């Protein structure tokens, strides 16, 4: 029986480039060699596609940035990809240009099956404003928030500060609407810190989410499925910093993951059910990770959904499934099965 030709896309133009490389390194290592011919394709920060030989060199030698040995126009980049006649693609690309529906639409046009969310659900899961609107429509509990665009600054900061003071209070969080891995996020303790947080956030996006600060625990749940959806046991993040930012996620070894989380059975059941509900709210398919806040009074709030979560061997998504009874190589099998089923 011939092996399935599995393309693994990684790197990309987003600020989460290095995280993507680390995730892909785990995927190519753990995919079953007897079942798949793994063919990696790196994408540089400029959007150039790199062929398998160069990509293997990056993955096998601990290099965390994709660089092309020569400049390629878009036609050459696509040709590098198409020449390998892939059966399926795993886009291990986090953030804009990989997780937001653009790449998924490209693969749809090429009629190549791929793992994970569709164009629609990718876009909805990437844009926090759209995501939160969908959660509201489906009556999914979440933290209070406000959305601001750059044109809201035309009348100065006073109106924004007044609204935050009335509706959210201090401290609060400021987040770019279309970034992941907590890139560009600020914790704002007082009105005097708003200007700096806006400047930081608008560097990454044209609209920002202001979100109330929630005192409590950070819980995560992994989701898997198409029409029939299941959720893993939940895990807990114990950040070594004031909040779980990019440094805490990927560079600070003080952060601890508790898998599975120590929770009452009723909270576990509620987290799993809410994770599935959030997944269905964005019309999800394949896989996703859903993040929660567990308030000190026991109320569970959905924070966000990630349609291409971190996928290193040590990332929460695969570790939660391992704790639930599905190991990493079998998880890859299941994702491929779901992707082909969805065609």
Curated annotation (Swiss-Prot):
InterPro entries attached to this UniProt entry: ATP-grasp, ATP_grasp_subdomain_1, D-Ala_lig_Van_CS, D_ala_D_ala, Dala_Dala_lig_C, Dala_Dala_lig_N, PreATP-grasp_dom_sf
Annotated positions binding Mg(2+) 2: 304, 306
Cell compartments where the protein resides: Cytoplasm
Binding site for Mg(2+) 1: 291, 304
The enzyme's E.C. designation: 6.3.2.4
GO molecular function: ATP binding; D-alanine-D-alanine ligase activity; metal ion binding
Pathway, per record: Cell wall biogenesis; peptidoglycan biosynthesis
Main location class: cytoplasm
Keywords in alphabetical order: ATP-binding, Cell shape, Cell wall biogenesis/degradation, Cytoplasm, Ligase, Magnesium, Manganese, Metal-binding, Nucleotide-binding, Peptidoglycan synthesis
Cofactor note: Binds 2 magnesium or manganese ions per subunit.
The ATP-grasp domain, residue ranges: 132-337
Gene Ontology cellular-component terms listed: cytosol
Keyword Iron belongs to the record: no
Chain residues that bind ATP: 165-220
Cofactor annotation: Mg(2+); Mn(2+)
Gene Ontology BP terms: cell wall organization; peptidoglycan biosynthetic process; regulation of cell shape
Catalytic activity as recorded in UniProt: 2 D-alanine + ATP = D-alanyl-D-alanine + ADP + phosphate + H(+)
Family note: Belongs to the D-alanine--D-alanine ligase family.
Annotated function: Cell wall formation.
NCBIfam families, A to Z: D_ala_D_alaTIGR, PRK01372.1, PRK01966.1-4
Protein name: D-alanine--D-alanine ligase
Species of provenance: Halothermothrix orenii (strain H 168 / OCM 544 / DSM 9562)
Gene that this sequence comes from: ddl
């Amino acid at each position: 029986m011939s092996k399935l030709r599995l393309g693994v896309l990684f790197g990309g133009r987003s600020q989460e480039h290095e995280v993507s490389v680390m995730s892909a390194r785990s995927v190519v290592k753990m995919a079953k060699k007897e079942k798949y011919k793994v063919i990696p394709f790196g994408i540089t920060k400029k959007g150039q596609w790199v062929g398998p030989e160069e990509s293997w060199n990056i993955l096998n030698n601990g290099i965390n940035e994709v660089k092309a040995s020569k400049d390629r126009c878009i036609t050459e980049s696509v040709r590098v990809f198409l020449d390998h006649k892939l059966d399926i693609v795993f886009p291990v690309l986090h953030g804009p240009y990989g997780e937001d529906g653009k790449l998924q639409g490209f693969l749809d046009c090429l009629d190549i099956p791929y793992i994970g969310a569709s164009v629609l659900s990718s876009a909805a899961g990437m844009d926090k404003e759209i995501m939160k609107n969908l959660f509201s429509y489906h009556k999914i509990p979440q933290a209070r928030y406000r959305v601001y665009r750059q044109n809201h600054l035309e009348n100065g900061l006073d109106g924004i500060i007044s609204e935050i003071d009335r509706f959210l209070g201090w401290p609060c969080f400021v987040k770019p609407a279309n970034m992941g891995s907590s890139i560009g996020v600020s914790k704002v303790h007082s009105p005097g810190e708003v200007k700096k947080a806006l400047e930081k956030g608008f560097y990454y996006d044209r609209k920002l989410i202001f979100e109330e600060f929630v005192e409590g625990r950070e819980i995560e749940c992994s989701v898997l499925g198409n029409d029939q959806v299941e959720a893993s046991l939940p895990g807990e993040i114990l950040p070594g910093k004031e909040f779980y930012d990019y440094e805490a996620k990927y560079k600070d070894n003080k952060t601890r993951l508790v898998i599975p989380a120590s929770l009452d059975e009723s909270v576990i059941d509620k987290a799993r059910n809410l994770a599935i509900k959030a997944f269905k709210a964005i019309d999800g398919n394949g896989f996703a990770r859903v993040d929660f806040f567990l308030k000190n009074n026991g109320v569970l709030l959905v924070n966000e959904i990630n349609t291409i979560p971190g996928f290193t061997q040590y990332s929460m998504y695969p570790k939660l499934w391992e704790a639930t009874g599905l190991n990493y190589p079998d998880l890859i099998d299941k994702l491929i099965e779901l992707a082909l089923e969805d065609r």
